[in-house]
Amino acid sequence: MASLGSGNWSGVPTQSTAPMPWVTILQPFPWTVPSSQPQHNRVKEDLLELMMLQNAQMHQLLLGQLVADALNPGPEWPSPPVHTDSHEEQMEEEMEMQEQEPLVYHHHYLPCPVTPLGPMSLWPASFLPVPPHQPPWQGEPRIQHQPPASRQEEVRDVPPPPPPSATGTVGADVPPASDYYDAESLP
């Protein structure tokens, strides 16, 4: 490096001049705009890179937990109890279990609570428009009465519900299944 004032180009600076500090020159690179369409191969590469990062993070978490457990041993898990009963005691317990009657569970269902019907809309939200294929709700629902069909043309689409005795709820006030149906009601 040459000193500025001496005119000496031999490469050896004179004693009177201070050495020049290094200068870093930054040149901006032209900006490249990435393409708006993602490249098919690049998406696969990015996904693979993310999966590898996730794998490395999970590996790091597991190893960190193993190291923490090794450095700070916690309380041991309780071991299962060891039975030291004799063979005769075990046989007696099995006999007692067999002698006991099986448990019978009766399911009693409460009636469904009925909410009072007030001015409720049939459509879930008032700000949504009614679909074009449905007419808007017009007050109370209409009930149409039709004459009963003749017995010869009557076809049951749905079988009748089972009698209460079939569901295991036979009691003093519930008749058995044979009394529940009469021969005329069956097809």
Curated annotation (Swiss-Prot):
Signal peptide: none annotated. Coiled coil: none annotated. It comes from the Eukaryota. InterPro entries: DUF4587, PRR29-like. Pfam families: DUF4587. Residues 133-187 are annotated as: Disordered. This is Proline-rich protein 29.
